Swiss-Prot record:
Cofactor(s) of this protein: Mn(2+)
Binding site for Mn(2+) 2: 80, 108
EC number(s) reported in the record: 3.1.-.-
Organism annotation: Influenza A virus (strain A/China:Nanchang/11/1996 H1N1)
Class of the enzyme per the UniProt entry, highest EC level: hydrolase
Protein name, as recorded: Polymerase acidic protein
Ligand binding (Mn(2+) 1): 41, 108, 119-120
Cofactor: how and how many bound: Binds 2 manganese ions per subunit.
GO MF term (any one): RNA binding
Subcellular location: Host cytoplasm; Host nucleus
Disulfide cysteine pairs (residue numbers): none
Keyword Phosphoprotein on entry: yes
Taxonomic lineage from the root: Viruses, Riboviria, Orthornavirae, Negarnaviricota, Polyploviricotina
InterPro entries from the UniProt entry: INFV_PA, PA/PA-X, PA/PA-X_sf
Length: 716
């Protein structure tokens, strides 16, 4: 093959091909087919440019070599064949003088008449396959693509072939001659089979046989074969077409596609009104734990036993009093409910054997708090369908609430590290395949970054509470069962620790359907004074129940201990998802993994170790009014986990709607940033759809606030 190349091609082309292979560290003695391919490509580029000039009137003309008029301007600038540095210098110079957009990859030519870069392709395979590979690689509508094959086929962007037919015929004839010469020497088959694609998934992918027949049969009317359809799709100009089609569909539809520019989007309007309130099923950053280390008491692991043991660690109990009343509730009933819990725990301790579960006495205060006998009586529809004024009961629109900074503080706290370990490394067994080894390594690195995270504590707390509540709802449907809110962890030194956050009293729970509600009263310990942010605690009645001694830099200080009490409700389906909160770990691990994969594909090796161990590198975490926030890879892991956990804790229809609708606006903005010139119709309708989800949910309002920060910085 090497001898053939040296005989068949101009010595200047051979020399340029040798230099190109040397520059890329390839041996032409071994890569002989590549040597031939580079020479062929160079020759086609030169032939494309040959004899084409621009006259004084700016028209493209063809001048044969013997013509003496040498003062004409060449129509094409040849970029292919130059060393990389020189080639980029030429490209930059062209961009500066013509205003053309700088391409991501080095093109082959620049056409001064059409003012565009050209990528020339020469393929031994089907032209449309190679064309798609080129288009996928370049990803730019500004660079014109023109593909030739050794069989005389060609394909170009928008079926615009740039050159006159005679010039293209000269190139096709030369390629056919090269093929014949190779075939006569027995070199063609090896050369044809050696072609590699543009490193895409479609490499060496040919549609043949049944699939080809089905493809031709599946085309829209008016298209005889797949190539024609591909050429049509490739040359399709959407502007104006979509509007026309829409107006055909309905007389009411009148969509004008408007260009989406940097000045087009406005911030999302957040609602006005009183500040939003805390609506999670349990306290987050404000919770307080009563803990025991190295538990080894009798009945260890039985929740009620553990709870009593934790309660005994605190000695500062005092007569409870209401410090922040609930606006609408009967606050003395909340106070009496806590006193009842204390009294019944006292009674248990005096018994000879502590029971495994505790059902509370059905006192008037608990009946009120749990909504006993408060549900309207259900009547069979057949018995009342003849009543003339039968209607669904009136329900008020939810009151609009404004964004409040406490939810940002909650999120920041969820991303922080605690001094405890909340998840253990899974024992999955020995790795067998290399992919398993990589997966284990990633899981171990990720676990190390998030095992101490407060969001992980929320996961374990949520799993425990939902599991215990669902079990009790099924096992003791009629009882007001007392359920301790417990979590387990390890200290930094590895000692086991059991924590008590407070108690839940469950109401009647005849849950037939997934959405049937069980009411419960939660009573949770805290050191947070509710009077500092009363709007956050709108749904709570807060009691002061004791004084806690805390170690500080100045010695021991006494702080009041509070009990946050509220009536709440949940359903079977919500508890089922709450029990599966560990999925949040998996979701955030997968997001981190996609970042590692992106890095690995660039470097062409697995980058897991470098990704986690390069402490000097920072990564984008999110947007804030100050701009893009960056942090260590550990911080990224914890932030992604916290987002996933908050999506679970604050799950709601408002969040579903906001996520789905704001994603559309996000994709449009991303397209604008990628210079894809997006167009939109009814942008006002999209904003309406987003803003109707902003009612009163704190997590949705925070996400909307973040989105506005993103819009500000993305469109600068």
């Amino acid at each position: 093959m090497e001898d053939f190349v040296r005989q068949c091609f101009n010595p200047m082309i051979v020399e340029l091909a040798e230099k190109a292979m040397k520059e890329y560290g390839e041996d032409l003695k071994i890569e002989t087919n590549k040597f031939a391919a580079i020479c062929t490509h160079l020759e086609v580029c030169f032939m494309y440019s040959d004899f084409h000039f621009i006259n004084e009137q700016g028209e493209s003309i063809i001048v044969e070599p013997e013509d003496p008029n040498a003062l004409l301007k060449h129509r094409f600038e040849i970029i292919e064949g130059r060393d990389r540095t020189m080639a980029w210098t030429v490209v930059n110079s062209i961009c500066n003088t013509t205003g053309a957009e700088k391409p991501k990859f080095l093109p082959d030519l620049y056409d001064y008449k059409e003012n565009r870069f050209i990528e020339i392709g020469v393929t031994r395979r089907e032209v449309h396959i190679y064309y798609l590979e080129k288009a996928n690689k370049i990803k730019s509508e500004k660079t014109h693509i023109h593909i030739f094959s050794f069989t005389g086929e060609e394909m170009a962007t928008k079926a615009d072939y740039t050159l006159d037919e005679e010039s293209r015929a000269r190139i096709k004839t030369r390629l056919f001659t090269i093929r014949q010469e190779m075939a006569s020497r027995g070199l063609w088959d090896s050369f044809r089979q050696s072609e590699r694609g543009e490193e895409t998934i479609e490499e060496r992918f040919e549609i043949t046989g049944t699939m080809r027949r089905l493809a031709d049969q599946s085309l829209p009317p008016n298209f005889s074969c797949l190539e024609n359809f591909r050429a049509y799709v490739d040359g399709f100009e959407p502007n104006g077409y979509i509007e026309g089609k829409l107006s055909q569909m309905s007389k009411e539809v009148n969509a004008r596609i408007e260009p989406f520019l940097k000045t087009t989007p406005r911030p999302i309007r957040l609602p006005d009104g009183p500040p939003c309130f805390q609506r999670s099923k349990f306290l987050l950053m404000d919770s307080l734990k009563l803990s025991i280390e190295d538990p080894n008491h009798e009945g260890e692991g039985i929740p009620l036993y553990d709870a009593i043991k934790c309660m005994r660690t605190f000695f500062g109990w005092k007569e409870p009093s209401v410090v922040k009343p609930h606006g609408k509730g009967i606050n003395p009933n909340y106070l009496l409910s806590w006193k009842q819990v204390l009294a019944e725990l006292q009674d248990i301790e005096s018994e000879e054997k502590i029971p495994r579960t505790k059902n509370m006495k059905k006192t008037s205060q608990l009946k009120w708090a749990l909504g006993e006998n408060m549900a309207p009586e259900k009547v069979d529809f057949d018995d009342c369908k003849d009543i003339s004024d039968l209607k669904q009961y009136d329900s008020d629109e939810p009151e609009l609430r404004s964004f409040s900074s406490w939810i940002q503080n909650e999120f920041n706290k969820a991303c922080e590290l605690t001094d405890s370990i909340w998840i253990e490394l899974d024992e999955i067994g020995e790795d067998v395949a290399p992919i398993e080894h990589i997966a284990s390594m990633r899981r171990n690195y990720f676990t190390a970054e998030v095992s101490h995270c407060r969001a992980t504590e929320y996961i374990m707390k949520g799993v425990y509470i939902n599991t215990a509540l669902l079990n009790a709802s099924c096992a003791a449907m009629d009882d007001f069962q007392l359920i301790p809110m417990i979590s387990k962890c390890r200290t930094k030194e590895g000692r086991r620790k059991t924590n008590l956050y407070g108690f839940i009293v469950k109401g009647r729970s005849h849950l037939r359907n997934d959405t049937d509600v069980v009411n419960f009263v939660s009573m949770e310990f805290s050191l947070t004074d509710p009077r500092l942010e009363p709007h956050k605690w709108e749904k709570y009645c807060v009691l002061e129940i004791g004084d806690m001694l805390l170690r500080s830099a100045i010695g021991q200080v006494s702080r009041p201990m509070f009990l946050y009490v509220r009536t709440n409700g949940t359903s079977k389906i919500k508890m089922k998802w709450g029990m599966e909160m560990r999925r949040c770990l998996l979701q955030s691990l997968q997001q981190i993994e996609s970042m590692i994969e992106a890095e690995s594909s660039v470097k062409e090796k697995d980058m897991t170790k470098e990704f986690f161990e390069n402490r000097s590198e920072t990564w984008p975490i999110g947007e804030s009014p100050k701009g893009v926030e960056e942090g260590s890879i550990g911080k990224v892991c914890r932030t992604l986990l916290a987002k996933s956990v908050f999506n679970s804790l604050y799950a709601s229809p408002q969040l579903e709607g906001f996520s789905a609708e704001s994603r559309k606006l996000l994709l449009i903005v991303q397209a604008l940033r990628d210079n894809l010139e997006p167009g939109t119709f009814d942008l006002g309708g999209l904003y309406e759809a987003i803003e109707e989800c902003l009612i009163n949910d704190p997590w949705v309002l925070l996400n909307a606030s973040w989105f506005n920060s993103f819009l500000t910085h993305a469109l600068r």
